[in-house]
């Protein structure tokens, strides 16, 4: 009898571990958003998911795909860190630098097509969807003259993410 009780208890414990937790509900009865936490090993996966998504959107719009550029990635990373320090999403660095200044500093030899930025708790794909909903940021993503892309972010301890996408030619 003791063995059977132990077996039933162990089975129940295993089944309980397999279930997904119920989401917390807000006062409106809808699930509360979950924090999107980026782990250090996620960098490549996130960058290539964004590149693939941008290129899918560009293909649907009839424009050529873009490829990653290490210098533009560096410029995007620098600006994401700087926006976090300033606690302000805007296109100028704390030293007054512009997007053009930043791509020149990292040695990018091409031309700046545009820069999209965001301060959010959303995923990269939710951020891309928000950019596609605005004519000015959509224009940067679908710019026919863009051939290169840089994409980076900084996530603060509280979960806030500072995203930067830079397009060049």
Q: Could you describe each region identified by the protein language model?
A:
Residues 1-7:
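Bacterial N-terminal signal peptides that target proteins for export
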Residues 19-22:
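Bacterial signal peptide processing site
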Residues 14-17:
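C-terminal motif of bacterial Sec signal peptides marking the signal peptidase cleavage site
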Residues 8-12:
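Classic N-terminal secretory signal peptides
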Residues 60-74, 87-96, 114, 138-154:
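Surface-exposed patches in mature extracellular/periplasmic domains of secreted proteins
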Residues 27-85:
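A short alpha-helix/helix-coil micro-patch that ends at or immediately precedes a cysteine
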Residues 25-29, 73-122:
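Short, surface-exposed glycine/acidic/tryptophan-bearing loops
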Residues 98-169:
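A well-ordered secondary-structure block
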């Amino acid at each position: 009898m003791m063995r059977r009780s132990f077996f039933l208890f162990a089975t129940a414990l295993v089944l309980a571990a397999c279930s997904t937790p119920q989401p917390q509900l807000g006062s409106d009865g809808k699930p509360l958003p979950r924090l999107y936490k980026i782990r250090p090993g996620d960098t490549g996966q996130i960058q290539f998911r964004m590149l693939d998504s941008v290129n899918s959107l560009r293909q649907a719009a009839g424009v050529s795909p873009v490829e990653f550029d290490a210098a533009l990635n560096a410029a995007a990373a620098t600006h994401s860190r700087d926006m976090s320090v300033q606690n302000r999403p805007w296109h100028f660095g704390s030293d007054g630098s512009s997007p053009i200044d930043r791509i020149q500093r990292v040695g990018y030899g091409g031309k700046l097509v545009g820069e999209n930025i965001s301060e959010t708790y959303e995923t990269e794909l939710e951020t891309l969807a928000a950019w596609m909903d605005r004519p000015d940021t959509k224009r940067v993503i679908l710019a026919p003259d863009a051939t290169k892309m840089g994409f980076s972010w900084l996530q603060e301890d509280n979960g806030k993410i500072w995203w930067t996408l830079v397009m060049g030619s």
